[in-house]
Design a protein with these regions (language model features):
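Nucleic-acid endonuclease domains
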Residues: 1-57, 62-147
């Protein structure tokens, strides 16, 4: 899984609007593979979505790197500039910084996610975790996702 992710990351290079300036590509591709294992479908990997489910729904996978196992109160995030992507569903994954383990957290229909999530502006400090937001985004707790 890691080798496949490294290969795809090298092939892709730095993405435009990348919050981590391309440094999260390997974790992102690992996250896509984890979501694919959990959801089924085909790995499509386009700008607008990453997976196409057997029912034709398009899924965009959002991956965060972490040093610890995720807890239900941790946030899942979608950057504001990503909300224009033509997907039906967001799926969320966390991958340990050393790539030794990953967690499929759940998913939610895009429209429902954007309605339920809290909008944060770049530079805002999230009061739930004291994190300074790096880009305008929509945050939702892991426990609010569907598994």
């Amino acid at each position: 899984m890691i080798d496949k992710a490294r290969s795809k990351a090298e092939e892709m290079g730095k993405l435009q609007n990348s919050i981590l300036k391309g440094k999260g590509n390997i974790a992102g591709f690992i996250g896509e593979q984890i979501a694919l294992e959990c959801l089924g479908g085909t790995w499509d990997n386009t700008y607008s979505h990453d997976i196409v489910l057997p029912n034709g729904k398009k899924v965009d996978v959002k991956t965060k790197q972490t040093s610890v196992a995720p807890l239900p109160d941790y946030d899942c995030s979608v950057a504001n500039f990503n909300t224009k992507q033509a997907c039906d569903t967001y799926a969320f994954v966390r991958v340990k910084n050393d790539f030794t383990v990953g967690w499929y957290l759940g998913s939610m229909n895009k429209k429902e996610y954007l309605e339920k999530a809290i909008f944060m502006k770049k530079g805002d400090v999230d009061p739930s975790n004291n994190y300074t937001v790096r880009a305008d985004c929509y945050n939702l707790k892991i426990k609010q996702l569907y598994v």
